[in-house]
Amino acid sequence: MRFQVYSRKLVIMMYFVDFDRTAFDTDSFIEYLKTHPVAGQFSQLPEPELAVALNAAVADGTLSFAPGELSHFLYEDAGRFLRDKENGVMLITYGNEALQRAKVESALHGIPRISTIYTGEVRKGEYLAPHIGMYGQSPVFVDDSIIELETMMDTCPGVVIYEMRRDGGAGDGRWPTIDLLSKLSI
């Protein structure tokens, strides 16, 4: 019998890390889109309508991102965290799968061994609930969205939850708040 070793790090803790506004500077990305040759035509749309237009453009192939094109939108501490934790991290992202996949694959180009869960329009806690037991005791979930944090709390009670506040503002108060992934205390 032959075994392949993919990583020498023993995974003791599993981290589920949100992509937009937790690992990826979505607000700067939206500003960048205003100058993008394809996406720029949608620049005046409010964010919900912008998302619909971008989803359609990715789906029909008129909008794509080159490998690494979006890597500078990955928060610096997020890149270090992902490289350090390797197989102990799963990115998890909500929203149109084609657009999310295009952003994630471009932003993470060059960072090996990172898995991503695309939940589509299913809330992250609801998506993970049937499978959370596979990830050991007390997996960690980090997100900036209150609805995602609440859903995780309601559907996956054993998960340790952190609220990400990249703006340094006060959190909701129900969970520990961090502004950098390096501040995770677990």
Spans of features found by a protein language model:
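Asp-based, Mg2+/Mn2+-dependent phosphohydrolase catalytic module
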Residues: 6, 10-13, 105, 109-141, ...
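Conserved Rossmann-like nucleotide-cofactor binding loop
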Residues: 22, 97, 147
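Substrate-recognition/cap helix-loop segment adjacent to the acidic, metal-dependent catalytic center
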Residues: 85-90, 94-119
